[in-house]
Regions:
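Extracytoplasmic/periplasmic substrate-recognition and gating elements
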Residues: 62, 98, 123, 185, ...
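Short helices/loops that flank or line small-molecule/ion binding pockets
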Residues: 115-133, 137, 149-150, 206, ...
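Extracytoplasmic ligand-binding clamshell segments of periplasmic binding protein
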Residues: 113-117, 121, 240, 245-248, ...
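Hinge/lid segment of periplasmic solute-binding proteins
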Residues: 40-55, 112, 126, 130, ...
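C-terminal motif of bacterial Sec signal peptides marking the signal peptidase cleavage site
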Residues: 17-21
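Helix-loop-helix "hinge/cap" segment bordering the ligand-binding cleft or interdomain interface
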Residues: 159-170, 178-249, 262-296, 358-364, ...
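Conserved N-terminal structural module of periplasmic/extracytoplasmic solute-binding proteins
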Residues: 7-8, 22-145, 365, 455-482
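Long, aromatic- and glycine/proline-rich binding clefts that accommodate carbohydrate-like moieties
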Residues: 384-449, 477-482
Length: 482
């Protein structure tokens, strides 16, 4: 395993999302661009990516160490990987039929704990005992570039594992493949999910205000931001909020930016006009009473409660995982009280990427697991039917969307993929940078006080500039649109 991995990781430990160590400038990974270029990069690498430079042993090991932040990936592996025998009662070890054990190391994503623990383990990877080395790990869209960066060389190129992205992953959505690629287009991870977002809404509130809960008719009420705002006045007149928080719209605006936060080779942050639109619209909506002033962000107790039956919030912009992992657990009423429809704009939120880790002694198992969970159409359809994930198979999601017999019990039998599938087809994403996570977090926290009337606009801007430079000292300027 290459020594420069650890030099870069030491720098990343100091600035979690930045990849600027060892005198090198931060790289970026393209999330859009030519599929042909990506295919050529993956094809060319088949000969040049030597697996032996990524593995620590010529013989397959007996312990597969996987780092993740919850049990989501484990349950998907258990559901579709044909070598699974059983998992221990505490969920820490999955036993395979060939005698190999999967050891799960789980740390929470909140406050960067997962990344910190993963980075610490990666810095010890070269000296770790064979059965203690990380074999696989997961990353999220906000920080995937940190691990797919070609210079860091942490995530093993799929071609080195014997996976051909063009042939083996040809049915995946293109934006998921390119998000998991380095700047040259070499794919270094794969995901079982795509994450288009819809508008999930309360049927009872829809009937009370609009006289119908029909998804197509409700879509007409939220077809674009201006229409949604006008409908919000109708909701407010009856004592309801359109959305819970200004944070609920951030991903729609933030994932639709035209240019990266930080261009490749630059040390300047460029705030996209879409971010300014989010700031202006959020302030306007909050002041107009369309949002709940008591809900100051996502993942808080107030936000969770706003999804309960006593809440006056009409709806939420959520991907499939948001319905299954967030909305459903927070709802204390009966099934069938929620429905989904197209929101004011199509966008992607999230994605869990699976990587083989440089230094593994289990490359064959790593390959098998990646293919089983992210590339096998039948397996992906099973995951969709069992967990309501919108899985990464274009043909499979088209089949599900057109299947009149498919329905989600939580949504009263509605088939949400009728709306998810076309939304996924229209998603484009701009280039990712190693600074995305920090920018996303700090722009929201810095302007929250402005939305709440505690500071003025210029102070909020100054607070963001100060906070972003404290997190990333190498940033030299923050450029705001005119």
């Amino acid at each position: 395993m290459k020594k420069k991995v650890f030099c870069i990781l030491m720098a990343m430990t100091m600035t979690t999302s930045a990849l600027t160590g060892c005198g090198s400038k931060a790289s970026t990974a393209s999330a859009t661009g030519s599929n042909t270029a990506a295919t050529e990069a993956n094809g060319d690498s088949a000969a040049s990516a030597d697996l032996s430079s990524y593995v620590s042993s010529a013989e397959e090991g007996k312990v597969i160490n996987i780092y993740c932040w919850n049990d989501e990936f484990r349950t998907r592996v258990e559901a579709v990987y044909d070598k699974v025998d059983h998992t221990s009662e505490d969920g820490t070890i999955t036993y395979l039929t060939d005698g190999t054990e999967i050891h799960w190391t789980v740390n929470p994503n909140q406050d960067g704990v997962y990344q910190k623990k993963l980075d610490e383990a990666l810095m010890n990877q070269a000296n770790a005992a064979t059965d203690d080395k990380i074999d696989m790990f997961l990353s999220e869209t906000d920080y995937v570039v940190k691990y797919t960066d070609a210079e860091a060389d942490i995530a093993i190129p799929l071609t080195a594992l014997g996976i051909d992205p063009a042939a083996d992953l040809g049915d995946q959505y293109d934006f998921t493949k390119t998000v998991a690629s380095d700047a040259s287009g070499l794919q270094r991870g794969s995901t079982w999910q795509a994450c288009p977002c819809l508008f999930a809404y309360r049927r009872d509130i829809a009937k009370d205000v609009f006289g119908t809960d029909d998804p197509d008719e409700i879509h007409a009420k939220v077809a674009d931001w201006a229409t949604m705002k006008a409908s919000g006045e109708e909701l407010k007149a009856k004592g309801y909020f359109t959305l819970a928080s200004y944070a609920d719209t951030f991903r729609a605006y933030g994932n639709s930016i035209a240019n990266p936060w930080v261009a490749s080779g630059s040390t300047e942050i460029n705030v996209d006009p879409q971010i300014m639109n989010w700031i202006n619209d959020s302030k306007e909506w909050l002041d107009a009473g369309l949002l709940d002033k008591n809900v100051k962000g996502q993942w808080t107790d107030d936000w969770n409660k706003s999804q309960g039956s006593a809440s006056k919030v009409f709806g939420f912009l959520l991907p499939a995982w948001g319905i299954d992992f967030v909305l459903k657990p927070n709802w204390d009423g009966a099934d069938g009280e929620w429905a989904v429809t197209d929101g004011p704009q199509a966008f992607n939120w999230g994605g869990s990427f699976v990587h083989g880790c440089s230094g593994t002694d289990n490359p064959e198992h790593v390959k098998d697991i990646i293919l089983a969970v992210t590339a096998n159409k039948d397996n992906l359809l099973k995951i969709t039917k069992d967990y309501l994930d919108f899985t990464n198979t274009k043909s499979g999601m088209t089949e599900i969307a057109n299947d009149d017999s498919f329905g989600a019990e939580f949504l009263g039998g509605e088939n949400p993929f009728k709306y998810f599938q076309p939304a996924a087809e229209s998603i484009t994403m701009t280039t990712l940078s190693p600074y995305d996570q920090g920018c996303v977090e700090l722009i929201q926290s810095s302007f929250s006080d402005y939305f709440q009337g505690q500071v003025d606009f210029d102070t909020a801007k100054a607070n963001f500039e100060r906070a972003i430079k404290e997190r990333y000292p190498e940033i030299t300027a923050v450029n705001w649109p005119e």
